[in-house]
Amino acid sequence: MRKTKIVCTLGPSTDNEEVLRQMMLEGMNVARCNFSHGTYEDHKKRMDMVKKLRKEVGRPVAILLDTKGPEVRVKNFKEGKVILEEGQLFTLTADEVEGTKDKVSVTYNRLYEDLEVGMRVLIDDGLIEMKVEKNDIVCRVINGGVVSNHKGVNVPDVDLSMPYISDKDREDILFGIEQDVDFIAASFVQKKEDILQLRKLLEKNGGEDIKIISKIENAQGVANIVEVSDGIMVARGDMGVEIPYEEVPVIQKKIIKKVYRAGKQVITATQMLESMIKNPRPTRAETTDVANAVYDGTSAIMLSGETAAGSYPVEAVKTMVRIAERTEQDVDYRKRFFLFEREANPDITDAICHATCTTALDLNATAIVTVTKSGRSARMVSSYRPKSDIISCATTEKVCRQLSLAWGVTPLVIKEEKDAYALFDKAIMAAEKKGFLKKGDLTVITSGVPIGCSGTTNMIKVQIV
């Protein structure tokens, strides 16, 4: 079974029911709805289609809502766009003006309070670079080019004082709660307080069971938010704008390692198979990029425009599956396990999960079976990246879907039993019925006793099917 999960962005190219069905059958694990684009009507139709088709195909495909985030953008130009020339002055203003070659309004009217003379300002994913020369954001153009309406503005190494949750994001998140999404991907996270604020909003409005994936997009976000997030998305597009491009691969590897060793999920995203937006095959460089993320141990790899707006969405999923499966065959899981740097003082769940993986490795077990209420034990087992398949039996569909993002985990739903051994037998039978196990397979089971208490993982059982 493939260990690395695949996140696919929905869009016009996936609005055909048969296309989306094929994407699920080929290996899509998570459907991403990008709320930087589209209407609520668009997103609801797509979410409803996912819910309908995942029942039909019998796959626990999760839904991820990706917020727009607290972005700064230029507003409108009189002619729709302008050409900025190297060396000229250009002003970003809080005043409402019709944009010209000399001046344009920005969406955040207090931006000038956060900037100082000498700071860099980047427009349109860094294609246009300017430097502040006066306090009212008069900039000298370093690299010129075309700027059109609503292009993004980035200020590297500056913690902007704008509110983290915008009015739009708040409404989008409340909509997501209504639609029973499984994950919120929080954009432009700079500090852990941003996530605590988001979690408070979820808890206040009945979304406490939604997992938060923090998108790391600048230098401030790398160090301080893993502990309060349920997962991390390495958003290499915006990261490449604010961090020197030669640093992106180094930071990507460090983030992946840090996050999965903390027992959390990590998604590697942006431009993974971008040429497949227009072409049926990837470049060799893209193939290597996907494979390197798999070698690094990423939980998931993500398709954006390739599936949302591309000509070959199903082929893009097939391609990712082929690359991931082939790369996983080459990974030395035993070596990776023994090189794992553990916490000095693990809790009981962590210690039991480590012992489970050790036992599975020693016995060359076909599978590790976790019986879980919250999904934590499955994620902790996953963090050790064992060679054995991880079959996780959850007692709710929500937890089952959320485990679809966890590396190496094949999630199933089973009804809760009060008797532990009856529950273990039910888990084995469910896995056998799905074809994940067969007679004679050796399994290592881990769970908590008493049954049904979240966070009580405390036992290991070796069982032959």
List where the protein language model places each region.
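Non-catalytic helical/linker scaffolds that mediate oligomerization, partner binding
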Residues: 1-465
